């Protein structure tokens, strides 16, 4: 793999890693509904403000979010709203996985009777 291709994959991985935490996923899905202030995000995810701020910083650095000041508030929104489509794909993959596992459990329970 050449250096440019490697760098491209590293940047892609950075974006995926920026979404790769349960709190960050919740923030992304919340911000899919529109711009929100930190106070609303903290309330929604139920985490400490400092913890939420750290997660927001990771996503800002990766280019997933953007922020702006509105008086004393800091407002956040998705910089790349299409990330929600990626998460919908992840949701579908999870549903399919759960269906496969449910089928295996059903088969196992019928064998053990």
Predicted regions and their residues:
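Short, hydrophobic-biased segments on the C-terminal half of alpha helices
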Residues: 56-57
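Residue-level detector of secondary-structure transition/capping positions
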Residues: 35-36, 60, 91
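Alpha-helical residues within the helix-turn-helix
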Residues: 43, 60-61
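Amphipathic alpha-helical dimerization/coiled-coil segments
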Residues: 1-7, 11, 83-113
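N-terminal helix-turn-helix DNA-binding core of bacterial DNA-binding proteins
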Residues: 2, 7-50, 70-83
